Amino acid sequence: MLRAVEAGMRDHEWVPLPEIARSCGLGERKSEFRLRSLSQKKLVFLENLHYQGSQIGFNAYDLIALADLVEKGSVTGLGNRVGVGKESVVYEAVGDGPLIIKFHRQGQTSFKHVRRARDHLRDLPRGSWLYAANLAARHEFRVMERLYPAVSIPRPVACSRHALVMEQISGSLLQKVELADPGECLEMILMNMQKAFQLGIVHADLSEFNVMVAGDEIKIIDWPQAVDTTHPNAVELLKRDLHNILEFFARRYRIKTELEEALEMVRSGGDLILEHFRR
């Protein structure tokens, strides 16, 4: 029933009862009874327009995606919620080792703002919040597959609808740790930015809030807004990423690196980063 409403939302903001009944192979009366039952559980929302319309929310969409991931064998169990942001909810999970499931929530914020900010969402019709989250998850998964393992990121495992599964990583956010060797950490971040650039990707939202540090290793997380290096604003977005990182290290650790010099290092594809930090 939930999948029938989901399918209908490709063409309708509020899916008509007859279409849901046809999709389920049930009569309208039985379909209406089940929809009202799901509505009481806050899995379906009902609206009386000039027809009776139904719509699912993110709770139902989470269940559909999770069921699909279990059926495919990607996930065998769901754990605690470990993070909530403006555009995602993150849970621990179990599968082939400890995992994380990131449920995208792009449509939960201003859809107009999200569509304007994300190139892969620009052509969506108004109100397609469900598919905004779906496309954001698939975009992030494709980017991670392109980067892994050359760039130090969590290993991508699977994607279903708006749910992205990846390996669970240890460590703390760069913003929260006190680094023993901040220069080495900055070098690793720049090296990974360089590798991503060589693979045709700019993070486009990089800061101390999406770099994880564990011992002498880092992992760069949160790639839904990443752009290709052929994007007309790629260089400006790369400069913004670099500004955020360099500003953090200058403020916290008094390590000063010129933005234009760092930009040349990341774009060079050579050994300029190593030479800079070995001086």
Task: List each model region and its residues.
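Conserved kinase catalytic-core helix
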Residues: 19-21, 25-28, 131-153, 175-214, ...
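C-lobe/activation-segment region of protein kinase-like
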Residues: 26, 198-203, 215-279
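Conserved ATP-binding subdomain of kinase catalytic cores across diverse folds
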Residues: 29-30, 41, 45, 62-173, ...
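Short, hydrophobic-biased segments on the C-terminal half of alpha helices
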Residues: 32-36, 193
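Short beta-strand "wing" residues that participate in macromolecule-binding interfaces
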Residues: 45-46, 204
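Accessory beta->alpha helical hairpin/"wing" motif in late/C-terminal subdomains of nucleic-acid enzymes
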Residues: 48-65
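Short, glycine/acidic-enriched loop or turn micro-motifs at the edges of active sites
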Residues: 105, 170, 208, 213, ...
